[in-house]
Amino acid sequence: MSQALNFFVSSSSRSPATFTISRPSVFPSTGSLRLLVKKSLRTLVVEASSAAASDLDEPQSSPVLVSENGSGGVLSSATQEYGRNAAPGTDSSSIEVDTVTEAELKENGFRSTRRTKLICTIGPATCGFEQLERLAEGGMNVARINMCHGTREWHRMVIERLRRLNEEKGFAVAIMMDTEGSEIHMGDLGGASSAKAEDGEIWNFTVRSFDPPLPERTVTVNYDGFAEDVKVGDELLVDGGMVRFEVIEKIGPDVKCLCTDPGLLLPRANLTFWRDGKLVRERNAMLPTISSKDWLDIDFGIAEGVDFIAVSFVKSAEVIKHLKSYIQARARDSDISVIAKIESIDSLKNLEEIIQASDGAMVARGDLGAQIPLEQVPSEQQKIVQICRQLNRPVIVASQLLESMIEYPIPTRAEVADVSEAVRQRGDALMLSGESAMGQFPEKALTVLRSVSLRIERMWREQKRHEVIELPSIASSFSDSISEEICNSAAKMANNLEVDALFVYTKNGHMASLLSRCRPDCPIFAFTTTTSVRRRLNLQWGLMPFRLSFSDDMESNLNKTFSLLKARGMIKSGDLIIAVSDMLQSIQVMNVP
């Protein structure tokens, strides 16, 4: 079967001429591709018309419902997600842009804007409003709250401060909530922020409960069968091997352990135990991925309107699918995305299926490195990043990026090289954990991520300019292939023509995500009518998300956008722009008037 590719060339002196070229169809039978060259406007327009549904259909609104028992049995009304749509009374002629993005663009120009996104875990060191503001000013795109630590009341306070920060200071910081997961981990250390385990010390790991403070050199464990499952001679790894113990004696619910590798014990650190050089996995495999506490935390996240829920220790795609159905049932118009944390052998065994089912993935290298040989972690990281790129899922590289900066004001050179490699692999985002949650230098750590990202991105663009990045087709994942073809073509045109920016007008973010996947040389200005979509796009590589009211009239949208951005000094007359849209499924090339 073949399908026509029509070229319409118009000028002011005569009627359009039409050229028809038959070729094997790359589009569904419901659509066609038109290339229009408007000489008088210096505008090249490529349009693909299709009967496929546009992603601009308005979702049906419904109240947010949460489970009171964490299992979905009893439902009650909860607070509507904040900022899902434009606030009532918002001026339709205005445009909302992150203040840091605007400043970066004005200061550095199109080519030198940062493309890699930055995530900060919020903890005692960064939970104040002024501290959050400094992180946002330093380039934080997403704030992460970890339900392993703190109470829901504390996390609600942080979320409220982040909302206030966005509303009052002009930021678009998204919120990501991590579930605790059902893996075996330590308790809270009796309220202490940390404890130092020295070489040769004897520590007691127990399932008994104690009122603070804990007895000296005692650690509680969350798994009741811990003392029964471990054996004398087993090796116990804390927090991915940051501290190591050898089991030397079992006395009822207590397990006596000898410290063989000293280090810092942190509250609720993950525990794994090895026997004869192999990870003991049987007990962990029997634990559910999402615990009863996790379900209550998820209900909390839905009620508070978080943008992302990151699921710990995902074992299969079915877990992700179940959670997405759960969220949809309780908030039908919810924009919450589900991120799969890849941090176990089970995750690696079902990697592609898990990523396909999710809305993104996190390479949690710390816990992953506790279950596979250390030398295997870099290759697995690269594999995960590549699969996410192929399947058009944002990917976060996390854990121990700048671990030394928890205590020191500058990173090791090896850490800088590690960050550089993550940027070079073109992951969407880098994440700080303990560095920002409890470290002494959270702002400096963020500055390091930002500066290294900028340098490596600039170097990569200079070395790889005009290089065509071939990606496998993902059209089978969507209802049609037109959007993918348009975005691939637009990105290649942008590189070849050395345009200043790509504009994309999108309701649900799909077209913007496809453009981000192509990793073009220029920045991508993503315009959406929905505040929650704007925040969600803040996770993806190269996207500068704006909230803007627009119509189906692309000429009107472009004129309006040009006027608003020129008034803010973000673009100027003569800048070369390529614009795509999911309304008309078109490509337009033009100079800013």
Curated annotation (Swiss-Prot):
Source organism, top-level taxon: Eukaryota
Residues that, per the record, bind ATP: N146, M147, C148, H149
Location in the cell: Plastid, Chloroplast
Pathway membership: Carbohydrate degradation; glycolysis; pyruvate from D-glyceraldehyde 3-phosphate: step 5/5
Entry EC no(s): 2.7.1.40
Pfam families to which the protein is assigned, alphabetical: PK (PF00224), PK_C (PF02887)
Region named Disordered: 57-94
Binding site for K(+): N146, D178, T179
Enzyme class: transferase
Gene Ontology BP, a term: glycolytic process
Cofactor(s) of this protein: Mg(2+); K(+)
GO molecular function ontology, one term from the record: kinase activity
This protein's UniProt keywords: ATP-binding, Chloroplast, Glycolysis, Kinase, Magnesium, Metal-binding, Nucleotide-binding, Plastid, Potassium, Pyruvate, Transferase, Transit peptide
Transit peptide in keyword set: yes
Tissue expression profile of the protein: Highest levels in roots. Also found in stems, leaves and flowers.
InterPro entries documented for this protein: Pyr_Knase, Pyrv/PenolPyrv_kinase-like_dom, Pyrv_kinase-like_dom_sf, Pyrv_Knase-like_insert_dom_sf, Pyrv_Knase_AS, Pyrv_Knase_brl, Pyrv_Knase_C, Pyrv_Knase_C_sf
GO cellular component: chloroplast stroma; cytoplasm
Similarity remark: Belongs to the pyruvate kinase family.
Protein name (Swiss-Prot/TrEMBL): Pyruvate kinase isozyme A, chloroplastic
